[in-house]
């Protein structure tokens, strides 16, 4: 894992610099297409295709661009060609994560994953978001994932910080206290 992070860092930094150096490039839009490319590159069939010595880089490029949901800007195409030409398709998910970290740092925000036992409606998510932003002291980009094992409550992961207010966590704390 550390090796992929080391490989991905220069690509993420170069992409960030290219996005900030060019006028009119929306960092949030760039984050969206980088995440989309990463999701495509994470597909095992695509990785197998990219690793096949009989398949050219241009063929891999055409497949990825063809699978992408939206038209990629020229910057994205140039970036993708560079990654493919250097044989780093497997590093795209890590490149996307590091690029997102750079963008978040520049905006003073962080990504937060809210694990909930039940779906959260927009109003509840807004309330949770406001509370979490006060708790963590920064603006958060929330994403919600369902985890029925929590029984109730939420578990929030922001970087390496975890806030667990789930029923499951409380039950485990009680169990530990009773068996101690």
Swiss-Prot record:
Pfam families: OSCP
HAMAP family listed in its UniProt record: ATP_synth_delta_bact
Membrane topology, from the record: Peripheral membrane protein
Record keyword Iron present: no
Primary role: F(1)F(0) ATP synthase produces ATP from ADP in the presence of a proton or sodium gradient. F-type ATPases consist of two structural domains, F(1) containing the extramembraneous catalytic core and F(0) containing the membrane proton channel, linked together by a central stalk and a peripheral stalk. During catalysis, ATP synthesis in the catalytic domain of F(1) is coupled via a rotary mechanism of the central stalk subunits to proton translocation. This protein is part of the stalk that links CF(0) to CF(1). It either transmits conformational changes from CF(0) to CF(1) or is implicated in proton conduction.
Origin organism lineage: Bacteria, Pseudomonadati, Pseudomonadota, Betaproteobacteria, Burkholderiales
Underlying gene: atpH
GO MF annotation list: proton-transporting ATP synthase activity, rotational mechanism
Keyword Magnesium in annotation: no
Keywords, alphabetical: ATP synthesis, Cell inner membrane, Cell membrane, CF(1), Hydrogen ion transport, Ion transport, Membrane, Transport
Protein name: ATP synthase subunit delta
């Amino acid at each position: 894992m550390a090796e992929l992070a080391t490989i991905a860092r220069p690509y993420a930094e170069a992409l960030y610099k290219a996005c900030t150096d060019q006028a009119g490039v929306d960092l949030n839009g760039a984050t969206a297409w980088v995440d989309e490319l990463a999701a495509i590159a994470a597909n095992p069939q695509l990785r197998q295709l990219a690793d096949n010595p009989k398949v050219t880089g241009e063929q891999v490029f055409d497949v990825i661009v063809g699978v992408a949901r939206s038209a990629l800007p020229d910057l994205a195409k140039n970036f993708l060609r560079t990654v493919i030409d250097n044989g780093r398709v497997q590093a795209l998910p890590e490149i996307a994560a590091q690029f997102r970290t750079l963008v978040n740092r520049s905006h003073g925000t962080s990504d937060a994953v809210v694990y909930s036992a039940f779906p959260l409606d927009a109003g509840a998510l807004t309330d949770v978001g406001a509370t979490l932003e006060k708790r963590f002291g920064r603006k958060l980009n929330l994403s919600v994932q369902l985890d029925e094992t929590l029984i109730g409550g939420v578990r929030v992961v922001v970087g390496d910080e975890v806030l667990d207010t789930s029923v499951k966590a409380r039950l485990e704390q009680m169990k530990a206290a009773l068996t101690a």
